[in-house]
Regions:
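Ser/Thr-rich, low-complexity intrinsically disordered terminal regions
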Residues: 1-133
Length: 133
């Protein structure tokens, strides 16, 4: 992959309604931590059909630049994003949560400590595009 790609994490997945807990580093956001946690970011709400919302998300994410879809099922999506400047790889997970009519999300940098809000801003851009689509 590249000098700044790092290794794929071994704790990926959505189990018991949660993603893996964020590391101590501030370079991760997750919708499945408690709301007062510094890593918290709200999930992506949807209305209407869960299947339609999921298809919309899959299409949106697949069209983003520097994106590699690794795992895609009917309720879980794992994507590697490569940053524009240095080519750092970030791991982003989405899970369809029909109980809450939301898509849960976790975005984390593989390397380094700080990400200068890259992961949070990416999720917010996806949220805006998802709401507008």
């Amino acid at each position: 992959m590249g000098l700044f790609s790092g290794s794929r994490p071994d704790n990926l997945g959505f189990r018991d309604g949660k993603f893996a807990p964020p590391p101590w580093k501030p370079n991760c956001v997750s919708s499945t931590v408690v709301k007062d946690d510094k890593h918290y970011i709200p999930p992506l709400p949807y209305s209407g059909s869960a299947a339609d919302a999921w298809k919309k998300l899959e299409a949106l994410v697949a069209g983003l630049p520097r994106t590699h879809v690794v795992t895609q099922t009917g309720q879980y999506l794992y994507v590697e994003f490569k940053t524009a400047t240095m080519g750092f790889v970030d791991d982003v997970e989405f899970a369809l949560d029909e109980k809450t009519s939301a898509i849960q999300v976790r975005s984390a940098s593989r390397l380094g400590v700080r990400d200068f809000n890259v992961n949070r801003e990416r999720v917010e851009r996806i949220r805006s595009a998802f709401a507008a689509a």
